[in-house]
Amino acid sequence: MATIKDIAQRAGVSVSTASRALNDNPRISQATRLKVKQVASELNYQPNYNAQNLTRGESNMVGLVFPVTTVTAPANPFHIDLMRGISSALKPLQYEMVVAIAPNPTELLASVKSMVTQSKVHNFLIFYTMANDPVTAYLRKHQLNFVVIGHPTAQQPDRFVDNDNVKAGQAATERLITRHGVQRPVFLDSGANWTYEEARRDGYRQCMTLHQLPAITWSASRDGDIRQFLDRHPEIDGIVCADDILYGQLNRHLQYYDLPIACFNNSRLMGMLLDESERVDLQPRELGQAGVELLFNSRKHHQLVDFKIYD
């Protein structure tokens, strides 16, 4: 395997000059940089990213921070696909993933602090957005590099990758109305005030207003038993569900009503539960890849990834 010394010798420069040229040091002339890079390419030189990072005082790891998750909570297929995309994007950069998962905000923050102080992790992807979040507040305070998956809150304009969830909410509702003849769809959400749920609900409301139809919403934390709610509202003839985890929890109750359904996340879980539904594919692998690209491109503030709808 070629070394920096081999490159320097063939290019006719010192080892320090070769190193600076490969790192685009502006003190090295453009001609020398091009020459050294050409030699490196000819020798199939593979830089030691880990050594470079240690020199800068950081590890070659990216911290993935999950939302607070209870021990009994089901695994989220969306997060798994996000990680697949992140892993594929990190591989050519010779970075690895390290994960922070905790049952409460205090333990989650402690885990992130440990990553920073003990493992020298300086780059993070945050799998959620929420107001007054202690983790992102800590990362901001210490000027660490991070990107959130999802739209940041108005109070903190953090760098982010996301789908246009308002547009996705509109599109899902429109499909039920135009393809299935639905006139009274209900929007179901967890009531946990997640930004993505609120945005999809806003899109649903906008579509209903456009069609001059009444908006009907149900929240798990507010409205109680879903079957009792549907029995009280016999006019409901369709369902827009905020995500696949929520639908999985409600599936055995909703099957009884046999209503057309539009659900977010085109996961394998949805493929098994909803054979004839409108599934909004938020392309989590592409979101994960975009998150890595943005993490290492400080000149860019955000990136939107398109969604697709399958039936």
Regions found by a protein language model. Give the residues of each.
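N-terminal helix-turn-helix DNA-binding module of bacterial transcription factors
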Residues: M1-N60
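Amphipathic helical "hinge" segments at domain boundaries
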Residues: Q46-L108
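Short beta-strand elements in bilobed, periplasmic/extracellular small-molecule ligand-binding domains
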Residues: K91-A102, Q156, V186-F187, R201, ...
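Structural motif
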Residues: M97-Q118, Q170, I216-H233, G248
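Flexible loop/hinge segments that line or gate small-molecule binding clefts
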Residues: F127-K167, I245, N265-S277
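Hydrophobic alpha-helical segments within soluble ligand-binding/sensing domains
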Residues: V161-F187, R222-R227, D281-K300
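An alpha-beta-alpha
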Residues: A172-L213, H301-D311
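Flexible loop/turn connectors
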Residues: R227, D231-D311
